[in-house]
Structures are given as structure tokens and as C-alpha cells.
Regions:
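Short basic alpha-helical hairpin corresponding to helix-turn-helix/winged-helix-like nucleic-acid-binding
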Residues: 58-114
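Minor-groove-contacting beta-hairpin "wing" of winged helix-turn-helix DNA-binding domains
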Residues: 63-67, 159-167
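Short, amphipathic alpha-helical interaction segments positioned at domain boundaries
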Residues: 77-82, 168-205
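An N-terminal structural lobe/cap that precedes and organizes the functional/catalytic core
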Residues: 209-211
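Short, positively charged loop/turn segments that connect secondary-structure elements
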Residues: 117-137
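Short amphipathic alpha-helical interaction segments
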Residues: 37-45, 130-148
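Eukaryotic partner-binding/assembly regions in large regulatory complexes
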Residues: 1-76
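A short, conserved structural fragment
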Residues: 50-58, 143-158
Length: 211
């Protein structure tokens, strides 16, 4: 292991430990450097963090993240259940709104409003999931949730004077997570679906270090 290659390790660790992704499409200059560093020598970073912290660095197609450890205890199971339920809900809503939703697509608030206007079923889903009572409220909340989950990045389009939200590689993480979960029985599948609403989430900063 060449320790000279690990100069970004402390900053990246804090970021990944918060439940965040480091994506190829990142617009933040520091995160671009981090992604390039991981691409150049991710094995060294993975080995260093595994030895010093026990965390496992995993990578997908254009993104890196800390893989969650599932030990079989009830708390870990509840965390998986919460993640699975949240991911399914969000991905299902996005595909209801726009079946062409994918990595690289650029969305806006006006996109969200147009999709909601054209989809009464999605409106009912938003009425249940989000605060507020109008399509404008739900569009704002949807964008906020997409940013929370890091499904989108953001930048200001100066010509249109509108914030653009390009879809990041993290979206593929959620789809893959859902597609690769396999249940050994219908009872276990139901227990995941019925997991407590207040179960910890991958995106809670305070819980990430306990995985």
C-alpha cells in the first residue's frame, strides 16, 4: 500500500461515513478530485479503511460508497427494512412521474410540476408522502428528497435562470439495491414491508458510524 496515495483519505472518510456517495458526475471540485483519486487507486483506500475502521468501500458504475454491514441483529435488520421501503417508494414514484428517469437526465421544478399535472396517481402518492396540499408544494418536496438521497446534483442555468438537477449515478445504486434484495420467505418480506417507520436510515449522519 502506498500511503502517499491516500492524501484525500480523511476528507473522503468523513464524507462517506455520513452515508454519502462519491460520484463521477459530481460538480463539487473536491468531490471530483476524490473520485479521480479513488479511480486511480481505490484498492489502497479500501484496504486502509478496512484495516483502520472496519468499513468496506464498495463501488458501482461511476460511484463509491461505504457498504453497510448486516450482522443479523434486529437493529441492523430494521435499518435494511427502512432503506428498502424508502428506496422502493422513491423509485416507484419517479417512474410513475417519468418512465425515462435515468442517470444523466436533467430535471427541474417545472419538470416535476408538469409530471404531476399529467399524473393523478402520482399526485395521490405525493399527498400521502409529502407535506403541503398543492402540486407546487409537492414539487418542492420531491426536489428536496431527491437532493437528500443524492439522486440529483444541482447547478444554476444562467440563461434560463432556473436551477437544473442532473441525475447522478447514485440513482443506479437504489435500483440495484432493490433488484438484488432476495427474501428467503414471504414472512421475512412482509416483516421488511411492515418495519417501524422510525427505523434508522442510511442517510442519518449519527447512525452511519455504527454500521
Amino acid at each position: 500500500m502506498d500511503l502517499n496515495n491516500l492524501r484525500f483519505a480523511p476528507q473522503m472518510f468523513r464524507y462517506l461515513n455520513g452515508g454519502h456517495f462519491i460520484c463521477a458526475s459530481a460538480r463539487n471540485e473536491d468531490q471530483k478530485k476524490w473520485f479521480d483519486a479513488l479511480e486511480a487507486g481505490w484498492e489502497d483506500y479500501a484496504e486502509a479503511w478496512r484495516k483502520t475502521t472496519g468499513f468496506e468501500l464498495a463501488r458501482g458504475d461511476g460511484y463509491y460508497y461505504f457498504r453497510k454491514k448486516i450482522t443479523g441483529d434486529n437493529r441492523s435488520f430494521e435499518k435494511v427494512a427502512a432503506d428498502y421501503r424508502d428506496y422502493c417508494t422513491m423509485v416507484d414514484l419517479l417512474y410513475r412521474l417519468d418512465q425515462s428517469f435515468c442517470v444523466g437526465k436533467v430535471v427541474t421544478k417545472s419538470w416535476a410540476l408538469q409530471c404531476l399535472e399529467a399524473n393523478p396517481a402520482a399526485q395521490e402518492t405525493c399527498r400521502t408522502l409529502f407535506k403541503g396540499t398543492t402540486k407546487n408544494d409537492w414539487a418542492d418536496e420531491l426536489i428536496e428528497q431527491l437532493r437528500k438521497y443524492e439522486i440529483v446534483d444541482s447547478f444554476m442555468n444562467e440563461e434560463q435562470y432556473e436551477i437544473y438537477y442532473p441525475v447522478t449515478e447514485a440513482f443506479d445504486y437504489y435500483r440495484t439495491f432493490i433488484e438484488t434484495i432476495q427474501f428467503s420467505s414471504k414472512e421475512i418480506e412482509k416483516s421488511v414491508e411492515d418495519a417501524p417507520e422510525d427505523a434508522p436510515s442510511l442517510f442519518e449522519e449519527s447512525g452511519a458510524a455504527e454500521e
